[in-house]
Amino acid sequence: MEFMGQKVLHIGETGKGASFKMLVNAMLAQSMLIFSETILLGEKMGLDKDFLLNVIPNLVVAAPFTKAKAEMIRQEDYEVQFPLEWMHKDLHLATLTAYENDQPLYLANLAKELFANAKKEGLGRLDFAAIHKFLDGKR
């Protein structure tokens, strides 16, 4: 386990780690969506795309993973690290689990639909950062 990450967390009994991973991926998917929407709106407002991709990932409010995803967006190269279709699966599992536990996940449900539509457009086997390509309409 140590070679896979910087820190190994003991979450609890069997299955709790998978549950935690599902939660983290739901947060990751939603963070990718807001990052992409922010870049796209900034461009529509006349801000330079390279400026946005250089500055936003370094803001205190940005998730650290956006630095790597910014480069994918810049190069329009979505070589898979974590497939969009797997992100959709994790969002589906998270929203299903939320339903079963009577806990609404309004934004995760919306994210699930966006990732499903991107998958239908043929982006499923690309990295989940390809959601940017879907939101941009360049397919």
Predicted regions and their residues:
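Helical "substrate-binding/catalytic lid" subdomain
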Residues: K16-K138
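Acidic-glycine-rich active-site phosphate/pyrophosphate-binding loop
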Residues: M1-T14, P64-A70
